[in-house]
């Protein structure tokens, strides 16, 4: 009991039962299938429920994993030039503070170098097209950008090639290690999606998650 201090162990077990992580038969307590998946994939309670709820709604696995975790370590390659043109202190991180507001103000775009403007418009047309009231701070841009990274990987591009493609098309740079780490996490999350979908008899979601996982693994 020293290990738990004053914490009521019985209450903890009850809570884990309510979460459907544990089941009790007499004096025997075991992990449920759902509980085993959560434990082996080191999922937080909130992530576990996000996956379960999305699976029950039969959301696409790509959408599920990109909602779970955004790739936000993206930088504007031409941040210094943009800052000079607009006479502002321009943050280099794409998804930071007012960066998107600064650039995608109509007046701002007209002051940019033609090449940079085309890159910014390409970014806007691919990632800033949602109708959310809070756009661009609704999370849709990050989610779509994260989807793009995974889709490029499914085209058999290595992290180095993905970084190059992002620079060429959007003027956005990223570190290969960050891209690799994100894809590695996506594989783990897709595995969890597949297994949780099987537990809840959502065969279509499970199959799609399995196929996507294999493509990302390469």
Regions found by a protein language model. Give the residues of each.
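Short helix-coil junctions and helix-kink-helix linkers
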Residues: 1-7
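C-terminal helical accessory/scaffold domains
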Residues: 10-217
């Amino acid at each position: 009991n020293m290990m738990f201090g004053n914490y009521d162990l019985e209450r903890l077990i009850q809570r884990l039962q309510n979460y459907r992580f544990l089941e009790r038969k007499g004096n025997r307590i075991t992990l449920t299938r759902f509980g085993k998946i959560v434990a082996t994939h080191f999922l937080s309670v909130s992530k576990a429920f996000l996956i379960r709820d999305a699976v029950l709604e039969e959301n696409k696995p790509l959408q599920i994993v990109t909602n779970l975790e955004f790739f936000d370590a993206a930088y504007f390659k031409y941040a210094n030039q943009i800052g000079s043109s607009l006479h502002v202190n321009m943050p280099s991180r794409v998804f930071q503070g007012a960066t998107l507001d600064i650039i995608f103000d109509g007046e701002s775009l007209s002051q940019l170098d033609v090449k940079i403007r085309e890159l910014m418009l390409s970014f806007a047309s691919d990632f800033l097209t949602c109708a959310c009231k809070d756009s661009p701070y609704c999370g849709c841009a990050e989610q779509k950008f994260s989807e793009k990274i995974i889709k490029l990987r499914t085209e058999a591009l290595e992290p180095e090639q993905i970084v190059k493609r992002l620079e060429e098309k959007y003027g956005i740079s990223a570190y290969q290690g960050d891209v690799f780490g994100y894809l590695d996490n996506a594989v783990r999350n897709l595995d969890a999606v597949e297994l949780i979908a099987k537990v809840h008899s959502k065969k279509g979601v499970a199959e799609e998650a399995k196929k996507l996982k294999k493509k990302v693994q390469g």
